[in-house]
Amino acid sequence: MSYAELIEEQKEETRDIIAALLEDGSEPEALYTIEHHFSADTFAELEAAAVEAFKMGFEVLEAEELELAPEDGGGKVVCFDAVMESALNAELIDEQTEKLIALADKHDIDYDGWGTYFESDEDDEEDESEDKPEA
């Protein structure tokens, strides 16, 4: 897949992810932890990309080794996530994605998309009620 095709595919996936979250009732105004996923065959291949992602302002989570399922070709890969807090805004996430796809391309590693977690304002309401003094 070409660089341009990957960018377009990611833009489409971004909109699908956002739509699914909002349809499920996720809080539209919340800040989300956006985790961008990278993988390679060796830790050495990931190292320079992880350092550069950190310099770009992302929190870089510790790399780990994963065993692939047989239907995914088997074997092992190493991976890390570059994380940033962000509004659930397609254009902002597109900017992050484009920068990180370019980073992966530069270091000849794989950009494996992004993910986040459902955010609910119900948790905030529960937290607030826990903080209120009892009468």
Curated annotation (Swiss-Prot):
Pfam families, A to Z: RraB
Chain segments carrying region Disordered: 114-135
Extent of the signal sequence: none
UniProt-recorded name of the protein: Regulator of ribonuclease activity B
SUPFAM superfamilies found in the cross-reference section: Hypothetical protein VC0424
HAMAP family: RraB
Gene coding for it: rraB
Record's subunit section: Interacts with the C-terminal region of Rne.
